[in-house]
């Protein structure tokens, strides 16, 4: 009898300790799995969407800063008070300046004749006539100056004077091309409508909302670890319940055995 009592007591303590160990073990695994799942979900939600937004903003900011920092002088020169002049007026101004310079040279070359005429003595009423050699040299210089003025006149003036008339013609020629470009778009409009409807129908078929739970989404996404964690949690809870029932039954039998044999 004493041997049975001692054995029953030993068995009781063994099962109690085993139950405590199992409960602590499974509870720890349950807590760890739940904690890991919460961490994974928080990491999945906190992941930023990978796209071209960040790179585009970085590139545009770098380009703007590089442009403003590399050429501050060019930005300062582009003020509204000094508008940029077109190319054709610049050519006309250069031609006028050359003509004015040549005209001034011609007048300055002719002035010595007048000075020679004015340098006559006032007491005498006669005017000294210039020599024939002076006349010939003056005529030759005038002819050379006229030839220089003719040779220095660029042909751009004629092109500039004709260019305003050519621009309306080009505008008129561009108008039919615009009409031609509009007409194919109008012709291709029904085809685009048909293809758009077709694509819309396929999109409506494929884009129906699917009623799936979070666990199914995680399993379909390929997160096998999450699926395994969820199933392991369920298995652990069921194992804990079964072990608790088994320990309760054994403890009850031991209590009854003590009561009977004592």
Swiss-Prot record:
UniProt domain comment: The N-terminal region appears to be involved in lipid binding.
Biased composition (Basic and acidic residues): 112-127
Native species: Plasmodium falciparum (isolate Camp / Malaysia)
Membrane topology: Lipid-anchor; GPI-anchor
Keyword Disulfide bond annotated: yes
Assigned GO CC terms: plasma membrane; side of membrane
Residue ranges, compositional bias (Low complexity): 67-111
Residues carrying lipid (GPI-anchor amidated asparagine): 236
Compartments it resides in: Cell membrane
Keyword Zinc attributed: no
Protein name, per record: Merozoite surface protein 2
Any Pfam family: MSA_2
UniProt-annotated glycosylation sites, renumbered to this chain: 22, 36, 139, 211, 235-236
Biological process per Gene Ontology, one example term: cell adhesion
Name of encoding gene: MSP2
Taxon lineage: Eukaryota, Sar, Alveolata, Apicomplexa, Aconoidasida
Region spans: Disordered: 44-223
Propeptide regions on this chain: 237-262
General function of this protein: May play a role in the merozoite attachment to the erythrocyte.
UniProt cross-references to InterPro entries, sorted A to Z: MSA2
Main subcellular location of this protein, as a coarse class: membrane
Signal peptide: 1-20
Bias (Polar residues) ranges: 129-155, 162-190
């Amino acid at each position: 009898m004493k041997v049975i009592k001692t054995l029953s007591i030993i068995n009781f303590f063994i099962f109690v300790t085993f139950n405590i160990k199992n409960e602590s073990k499974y509870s720890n695994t349950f807590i760890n799995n739940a904690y890991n799942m919460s961490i994974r979900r928080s990491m999945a939600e906190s992941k930023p969407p990978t796209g071209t937004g960040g790179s585009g903003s970085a590139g545009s900011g770098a380009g703007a800063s590089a442009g403003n920092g590399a050429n501050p002088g060019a930005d300062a020169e582009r003020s509204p008070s000094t508008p940029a002049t077109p190319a054709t007026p610049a050519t006309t101004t250069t031609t006028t300046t050359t003509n004015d310079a040549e005209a001034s040279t011609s007048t300055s070359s002719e002035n010595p004749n007048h000075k020679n005429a004015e340098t006559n003595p006032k007491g005498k009423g006669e005017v000294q006539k210039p020599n024939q050699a002076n006349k010939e040299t003056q005529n030759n210089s005038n002819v050379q100056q006229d030839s220089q003025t003719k040779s220095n006149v660029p042909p751009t003036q004629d092109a500039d004077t004709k260019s305003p008339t050519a621009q309306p013609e080009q505008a008129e020629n561009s108008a039919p091309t615009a009409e031609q470009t509009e007409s194919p778009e109008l012709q291709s409009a029904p085809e685009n409508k048909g293809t758009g409807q077709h694509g819309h129908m396929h999109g409506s078929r494929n884009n129906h909302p699917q009623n799936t739970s979070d666990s199914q989404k995680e399993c379909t996404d390929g997160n096998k670890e999450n699926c395994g964690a969820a199933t392991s949690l369920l298995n652990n809870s069921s194992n804990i319940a079964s072990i608790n029932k088994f320990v309760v039954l054994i403890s009850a039998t031991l209590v009854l055995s003590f009561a009977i044999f004592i």
